[in-house]
Amino acid sequence: MGATAKVLVIFVALEHLGFLVMEMFYWQTSFVQKLFGVSPELAAESGFMAANQGLYNGFLSIGLMWALFTHKKDVVVFFLICVIVAGIFGAFTVKPGVFVAQSCPALLALVTYLLSASRMENKPAS
């Protein structure tokens, strides 16, 4: 895998680790409420759901990192597709900006990763 693809996959993994931290530990702070567009009342009512969502974002992050470090190409692709689908769903159910924040980086990482993998496979042996 090329360096650019690795950096992009790591970025997506770190982004989801950040979502875990915000949703599990800082959901009721004014910064996170403003970032996610929720009122203090809604944040108080939805804290357990946000924590659950944060946990799933953590699974995406860990899955991507595990796949990278164990060189599991198909698993990298699987987790990136999961992130893309989650972002598309979020765009329809929450707000369109979710697609930009979540799906676009994963889509860029996936395309770069697949192009990088295809170049590596087609590279002549030395």
Language-model features, listed with the residues they occupy:
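Membrane-embedded alpha-helical segments of multi-pass membrane proteins
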Residues: F59, V100-L107
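Alpha-helical transmembrane segments of multipass membrane proteins
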Residues: M65-W66, G87-A91, L107-V111
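Core segments of alpha-helical transmembrane spans in multipass integral membrane proteins
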Residues: L14-G18, M22-E23, L35-L68, I81
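Short, charged juxtamembrane terminal tails flanking transmembrane helices
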Residues: R119-S126
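Interfacial segments of alpha-helical transmembrane regions
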Residues: M1-L14, V75-V83
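Membrane-interface helix caps and helix-loop-helix hairpins in membrane proteins
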Residues: A91-V100
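Aromatic-anchored segments of alpha-helical transmembrane domains
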Residues: H16-L17, V83-F92
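Structural signal for the C-terminal ends of transmembrane alpha-helices
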Residues: F69-H71, T112-A117
